[in-house]
C-alpha cells in the first residue's frame, strides 16, 4: 500500500516532527593515529587569541608564559582572551548582590566536603595521566602509583586516607629537590626457538629506579596529557582533549565542588542537573521572560554559540573569581582552592605520541616522538605541519608545550558556567538602567540569551551590550554561528524549545539495540532503554511495543538463540532444540536459551529471570542460578549495575539497570597479548588493587558502608570488623563455638603477620 507521507503529519504538531530530521545513522567517526597535530593546533590557537599579552618566564621550569589578562580591549570581532580583572570581579559582586549569601553558603558546604572527602574519590574516572610512567593509566592505578612514590620519598600525610592530606603531600613534593620513581621498561632479545629453530624476540620486563630533579618533577606534575576526542559527529576536523595527572586532580575536584554548589543555586545554570530536572529549571526562565513581555515588549531569543570557549578562558581569571568568592573564609580554605588555577596558569601540554613516518620505497616505518620535535630537521614534514612546529618550538620543554592561557576541554565546566551566568545576571533592568533587559541560560560553553525590549532597536542594543560585556571577561559570542528568533523557539544543549521543550526521541536511537556485554546484561539494558524513553522522551505505547519486538529480534540474531520451535538453523540451534524438547514448562526458558518473550510494555521494569522464575522447571532454575557453575567466570553482581549508553549527540549517559546474576552473566577473559608487554607489571598491580578493594567491600557491604574513620589501615579495619561480626553472630546463635574460635584465631594470626612484616 502506498502511503502519502504528508498524511503522517496531519495530526502531529509541527514541533513533534523534529524526530524525523535525524541525521545521525551509522557509526560516529573515531580518530586514528596520533593526536600530536591536534594538540599543537590547540596550543598555537590559544596563544594566537592572547598574542598581545605579556611574556614572562617561569623561574622554576624555565617555561615561557603568555599572560593576556588586562590586555588591550578588542577593537574588532575577532575572538580574544583579554579578560579584564576588575570587570570579572564586578560581575561577581553583582551576582552576589542579587543572590545574597550565595558564596558564603557554598563555601561552608564545600568546606565540609573538603574535610570529609577521602583519597579514593580520585579513583573515579577513566584514563589519567600517570606522571610516574609518563603515560595514561586507569585512574585507580595512577593514584596507587603516585601514593607509592610519595611514600618511598618520605611523604606520608596521605596515610590518613583523607584527600586533603594527600594534597598536603602534593604541595610538599613540589618543594623537594628530587623525587625517586620506579619505572617499568622492557628489554628485547633475539633468541633462537628450540622447537622451530626460528629467531624470535623475547621480552623481559624490568623495574628501575630513576631520580627526577625538581625541574623535571614540576614539569611532570603540571603536565596535562592529550588525546583526540573520539566519536564527535558533525565535524570534519578532530580536536584534542586533556587528561590531568593526580597532582592537579584533587585540587580541581574541590574547586568544582564549590562551583557546583554555586550553580545549584543559580536559576540560569544548566549544570549540574540534567534530563527532566534541567528542562523544568530552564522552562521557568523562559516563562518568566515571556510573561513579562506579553503586553508591551518584544522578546527575542538567541541560540548562542561561543567561539573557542576554553581557549579564551584564563586560569588567572578563575583565580580572581575564587579569591573574591572565598574572601571571608579561613586562610587554609582559600589556599586549597587557589592552587588549581595557579597550577593551570603554569600548565604544560604533553604533545602525545609524535609523528609516524613511512618510506614507501624502502618499506620503513619510524616514529618521531614528541620529544624530538624541538630540534629535528623540518624538511621531512609537509608545509602545514612545518608551520605548526615552527610556531610551537619556542614553547617546547622535554616534549611538552608550555600553555599558560586557556583551559583545555572539560576542566572547569562548573566554574566557567558561574562566569557565564554572572554576565546573564547583569541583564536585569536595575543594572542595564535602560528600556532593554536580558536573561538566559548557561551550561558550560553553551548559552541561550533572551532579550526583551519595547522595539527592535532596543533588542539590537541589548544584544550589542551583552556581546561587548562578554568580551570584557574573555567570552566571545560568535555572530556567525548564533541565531536569533522570536522567543518560544530556540535550542539549548541539544534540547529544542518550542512552547515547551520538545521530546527529541530520535536522539536516543543509537542506544536502542544490543549492547554486547553479555546475554544477561544486554536483555536488561535493552528493555530499560525502552522503559526510560517511555518515561522521558514521549515514546508512545504502540511505538514502544514495536521497539520491543525489534529488540527481541535483534537480540535473538545477536546471540543465535531463536525459539526452540523455530525453523531457523544456527550454530546453537541443535542444543537449544534439545533443551526445548526436554523442558516441561517452555515459558520458563529465558529468551537467550531459546524461550519465548514474555515482555510487554507493562512489565519492562522486571528482570527477565524474576519474570519467569515461577514458570521455570526446577532443574532449570538450579542450573541457571548456580554460583558453582564451572564454565562461568563469575563476577559478583550488585543488584543494580551501570551501563554506558550512547545517545546520538552529547555525552555518553550512565544508565542504571537491574542485574540478576545467572550463568548468563559471563565476562569475557582478558586478551592474552597484554601479558607479554611492559604493561604486565601494571596489570598485576591493578588486579591486586582490585582484589583488595573487593575484599574490603565484603567486610563493609555497601548497605552498612560506614567508612572506617581514624587512621586504621584497611587490614586493621577488616580485622576489627570481622571480630565484631563474629561476636554478634556467635551470641545470636548463627555460628557455633568452634567457628567463632577459628575466626578469632585467624584474626590474631593476621595481626601477628603484620607485626612481623
From Swiss-Prot:
Biased composition (Polar residues): 55-64
Top EC class, one word: transferase
Subcellular localization(s) per the UniProt record: Host nucleus; Host cytoplasm
Post-translational events: Phosphorylated by host PRKCA.
Catalytic reaction annotation: RNA(n) + a ribonucleoside 5'-triphosphate = RNA(n+1) + diphosphate
EC number: 2.7.7.48
The keyword Nucleotide-binding is assigned to this record: yes
Domain RdRp catalytic residues, every copy: 286-483
Sequence segments annotated as region (Promoter-binding site): 249-256
Family label: Belongs to the influenza viruses polymerase PB1 family.
Functional summary from the UniProt entry: RNA-dependent RNA polymerase which is responsible for replication and transcription of virus RNA segments. The transcription of viral mRNAs occurs by a unique mechanism called cap-snatching. 5' methylated caps of cellular mRNAs are cleaved after 10-13 nucleotides by PA. In turn, these short capped RNAs are used as primers by PB1 for transcription of viral mRNAs. During virus replication, PB1 initiates RNA synthesis and copy vRNA into complementary RNA (cRNA) which in turn serves as a template for the production of more vRNAs.
Subunit details: Influenza RNA polymerase is composed of three subunits: PB1, PB2 and PA. Interacts (via N-terminus) with PA (via C-terminus). Interacts (via C-terminus) with PB2 (via N-terminus); this interaction is essential for transcription initiation.
Name of the protein: RNA-directed RNA polymerase catalytic subunit
Organism per entry: Influenza A virus (strain A/Turkey/Minnesota/833/1980 H4N2)
Lineage, top ranks: Viruses, Riboviria, Orthornavirae, Negarnaviricota, Polyploviricotina
Gene responsible for this protein: PB1
Amino acid at each position: 500500500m502506498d502511503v502519502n507521507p504528508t498524511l503522517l503529519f496531519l495530526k502531529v504538531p509541527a514541533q513533534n516532527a523534529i524526530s524525523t530530521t535525524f541525521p545521525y545513522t551509522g557509526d560516529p567517526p573515531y580518530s586514528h593515529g596520533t593526536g600530536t597535530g591536534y594538540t599543537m593546533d590547540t596550543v598555537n590557537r590559544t596563544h594566537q587569541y592572547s598574542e598581545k599579552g605579556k611574556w614572562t618566564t617561569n623561574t622554576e621550569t624555565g617555561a615561557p608564559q603568555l599572560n593576556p589578562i588586562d590586555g588591550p580591549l578588542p577593537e574588532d570581532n575577532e575572538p580574544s582572551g583579554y579578560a579584564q580583572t576588575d570587570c570579572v570581579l564586578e560581575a561577581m559582586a553583582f551576582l552576589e548582590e542579587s543572590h545574597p549569601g550565595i558564596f558564603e553558603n557554598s563555601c561552608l558546604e564545600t568546606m565540609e566536603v573538603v574535610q570529609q572527602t577521602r583519597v579514593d574519590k580520585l579513583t573515579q574516572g577513566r584514563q589519567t595521566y600517570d606522571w610516574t610512567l609518563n603515560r595514561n593509566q586507569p585512574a585507580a592505578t595512577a593514584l596507587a602509583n603516585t601514593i607509592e612514590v610519595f611514600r618511598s620519598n618520605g611523604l606520608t600525610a596521605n596515610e590518613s586516607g583523607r584527600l586533603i592530606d594527600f594534597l598536603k603531600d602534593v604541595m610538599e613534593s613540589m618543594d623537594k629537590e628530587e623525587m625517586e620513581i620506579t619505572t617499568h621498561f622492557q628489554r628485547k632479545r633475539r633468541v633462537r626457538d628450540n622447537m622451530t629453530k626460528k629467531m624470535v624476540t623475547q621480552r623481559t620486563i624490568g623495574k628501575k629506579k630513576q631520580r627526577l630533579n625538581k625541574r623535571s618533577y614540576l614539569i611532570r606534575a603540571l603536565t596535562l596529557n592529550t588525546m583526540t576526542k573520539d566519536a564527535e559527529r558533525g565535524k570534519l576536523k578532530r580536536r584534542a582533549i586533556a587528561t590531568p595527572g593526580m597532582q592537579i586532580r584533587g585540587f580541581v575536584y574541590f574547586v568544582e565542588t564549590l562551583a557546583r554548589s554555586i550553580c545549584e543555586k543559580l536559576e540560569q545554570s544548566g549544570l549540574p542537573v540534567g534530563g527532566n530536572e534541567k528542562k523544568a529549571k530552564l522552562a521557568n526562565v523562559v516563562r518568566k521572560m515571556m510573561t513579562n513581555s506579553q503586553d508591551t515588549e518584544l522578546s527575542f531569543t538567541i541560540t548562542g554559540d561561543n567561539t573557542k570557549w576554553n581557549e579564551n578562558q584564563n586560569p588567572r581569571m578563575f583565580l580572581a573569581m575564587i579569591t573574591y568568592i572565598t574572601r571571608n573564609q579561613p586562610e587554609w580554605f582559600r589556599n586549597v582552592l587557589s592552587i588549581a588555577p595557579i597550577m593551570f596558569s603554569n600548565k604544560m601540554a604533553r604533545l602525545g605520541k609524535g609523528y609516524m613516518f613511512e618510506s614507501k620505497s624502502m618499506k620503513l616505518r619510524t616514529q618521531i616522538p614528541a620529544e624530538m620535535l624541538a630540534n629535528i630537521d623540518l624538511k621531512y614534514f609537509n608545509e602545514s605541519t612545518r608551520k605548526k612546529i615552527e610556531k610551537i618550538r619556542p614553547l617546547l620543554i622535554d616534549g611538552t608545550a608550555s600553555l599558560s592561557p586557556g583551559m583545555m576541554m572539560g576542566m572547569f565546566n562548573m566554574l566557567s558556567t558561574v562566569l557565564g551566568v554572572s554576565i546573564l545576571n547583569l541583564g536585569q533592568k536595575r543594572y542595564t538602567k535602560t528600556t532593554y533587559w536580558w536573561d538566559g541560560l548557561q551550561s558550560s560553553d553553551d548559552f541561550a540569551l533572551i532579550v526583551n525590549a519595547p522595539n527592535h532597536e532596543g533588542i539590537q542594543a541589548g544584544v550589542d551590550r551583552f556581546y561587548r560585556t562578554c568580551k570584557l571577561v574573555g567570552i566571545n559570542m560568535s555572530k556567525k554561528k548564533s541565531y536569533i528568533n522570536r522567543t518560544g523557539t530556540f535550542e539549548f544543549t541539544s534540547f529544542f524549545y518550542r512552547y515547551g521543550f520538545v521530546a527529541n526521541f530520535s536522539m536516543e536511537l543509537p542506544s536502542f539495540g544490543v549492547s554486547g556485554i553479555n546475554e544477561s546484561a544486554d536483555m536488561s539494558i535493552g528493555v530499560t532503554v525502552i522503559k526510560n524513553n517511555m518515561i522521558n522522551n514521549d515514546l508512545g505505547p504502540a511505538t514502544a511495543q514495536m521497539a520491543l519486538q525489534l529488540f527481541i529480534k535483534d537480540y535473538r540474531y545477536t546471540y543465535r538463540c531463536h525459539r526452540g520451535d523455530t525453523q531457523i538453523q544456527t550454530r546453537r540451534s541443535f542444543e537449544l532444540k534439545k533443551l526445548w524438547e526436554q523442558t516441561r514448562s517452555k515459558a520458563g526458558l529465558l529468551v537467550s536459551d531459546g524461550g519465548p518473550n514474555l515482555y510487554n510494555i507493562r512489565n519492562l521494569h522486571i528482570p527477565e529471570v524474576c519474570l519467569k522464575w515461577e514458570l521455570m522447571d526446577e532443574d532449570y532454575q538450579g542450573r541457571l542460578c548456580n554460583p558453582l557453575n564451572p564454565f562461568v567466570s563469575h563476577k559478583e553482581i550488585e543488584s543494580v549495575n551501570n551501563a554506558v549508553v550512547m545517545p546520538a549527540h552529547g555525552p555518553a549517559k550512565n544508565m542504571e539497570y537491574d542485574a540478576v546474576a545467572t550463568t548468563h552473566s559471563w565476562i569475557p577473559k582478558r586478551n592474552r597479548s597484554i601479558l607479554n608487554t611492559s604493561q604486565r607489571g601494571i596489570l598485576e598491580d591493578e588486579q591486586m588493587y582490585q582484589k583488595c578493594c573487593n575484599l574490603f567491600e565484603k567486610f563493609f557491604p555497601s548497605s552498612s558502608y560506614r567508612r572506617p574513620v581514624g587512621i586504621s589501615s584497611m587490614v586493621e579495619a577488616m580485622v576489627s570488623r570481622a571480630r565484631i561480626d563474629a561476636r554478634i553472630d556467635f551470641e545470636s546463635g548463627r555460628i557455633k563455638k568452634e567457628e567463632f574460635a577459628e575466626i578469632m584465631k585467624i584474626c590474631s594470626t593476621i595481626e601477628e603477620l603484620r607485626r612481623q612484616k
